[in-house]
Amino acid sequence: AQDTAAVEQAMRRTGTLDWANRDVRALSGGERQRVYLAMALAQGGTTILLDEPGAFLDVRAQFELLDLLRSVAAGGKAVVLVMHELPQAMQYADRIALLGGGRLLGCDTSTALAATGAVDRVFGVRLCRAPDGVWYVKAEG
């Protein structure tokens, strides 16, 4: 009964409860991503590791997922994401590990990492922050 309750709660959090009786193979890629997150939440571990969690999701669903992961982290779980959407990572992550050329180039808060200029050098873009705090990139040149 406790396992069933954990699964139901995880499915409610991820908006997947209506799909409980559907074959996972019949789900879209984005729907599967949400089901996999529900599975991770239901297991009750202390850490969630996700590789490109926004893949296959439309823009709105990507931000809804990031908001959900933020609340999961606020609840005490460690949430580790591998992602290539730089502005989203800068906006949502408490800490960022910047990789380039197979090496760790820096690991810090968004603000501290941006101040080093490493992000700009690695990606050949200029990392900027709007007055409202939202991060964005400008292509150089």
PLM ranges: what are they?
Residues 2-19:
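Conserved ABC ATPase "signature" region
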Residues 23-27:
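Conserved ABC ATPase signature
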Residues 48-52:
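Catalytic Walker B motif of ABC-type/P-loop ATPase nucleotide-binding domains
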Residues 83-84:
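H-loop/switch region of ABC-family ATPase nucleotide-binding domains
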Residues 89-91:
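A short, surface-exposed alpha-helical micro-motif characterized by mixed small hydrophobic
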Residues 96-109:
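H-loop (His-switch) and adjacent beta-strand-loop-beta switch element
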Residues 121-141:
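ABC ATPase nucleotide-binding domains
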